Amino acid sequence: MKVLSSLKSAKTRHRDCKVILRRGKIFVICKSNPRFKARQR
């Protein structure tokens, strides 16, 4: 999982990527390709 300052590029990397909020942090999850997981500080 990458830690990024901006998730704008992370959510456009794959069409299955979704931006969600968990425990006060913003995550990008991708079920079909978990390589594209990311988190914002």
From Swiss-Prot:
Listed A to Z, the keywords are:
Ribonucleoprotein, Ribosomal protein
The alphabetized list of GO BP terms reads: translation
Query: Has keyword Glycoprotein?
Result: no
Organism this protein belongs to = Xylella fastidiosa (strain Temecula1 / ATCC 700964)
Recorded GO cellular component terms are: ribonucleoprotein complex; ribosome
What name does UniProt use for this protein? Large ribosomal subunit protein bL36
Cited InterPro entries = Ribosomal_bL36, Ribosomal_bL36_sp, Ribosomal_L36_bact
Q: Which domain of life is it from?
A: Bacteria
Query: Could you tell me which NCBIfam families the record lists for this protein?
Result: PRK00831.1, rpmJ_bact
Secretion signal, residue range per the UniProt entry = none
Q: What GO annotations for molecular function exist for this entry?
A: structural constituent of ribosome
Q: What family is it from?
A: Belongs to the bacterial ribosomal protein bL36 family.
